[in-house]
Amino acid sequence: MEKIFLIGVVCVILISIAVVDARKKKIPNILLGILFFCAVLSGFIFPEISWPDRIAGGILVSVVFLTVIWIRPGAFGAGDVKLMAISGLMLGVGRNLTAFGFATALAALYCLPGILRRDRKKESEIAFGPFLCVGILLSIFWGKAFIRWYIS
């Protein structure tokens, strides 16, 4: 029962983050704080993902984001980096990379029609948080199955 409750709370928080970021291009720290608390709780409620895997998951994608920011300032916001660090703590390395892959693919699909019509430049800014949130949700529910399918 606590697993379903925690997943429900995480879904509500991720939807809230997606809506706020889509409107304001900012992810509120209060929502990230609540999500962080849920991520820590998930370590006890879902022990099948080890703590070292969770910590590595939090660090890996965040380091990728920080590297991209260092190379191209403004490419991602600090909220995106924090969101993926928390996501990694919740999902572990494999599922967090899957979430990032889903998010990147969805963002590309969203931007591609505008680029092809020349309505949108390649340099145009979009809020990436909503795509990250959808990617995280997809990874929560189907990440493990996707990884198994991809590896086979």
Predicted regions and their residues:
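A membrane-topology feature that recognizes alpha-helical transmembrane segments
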Residues: 1-152
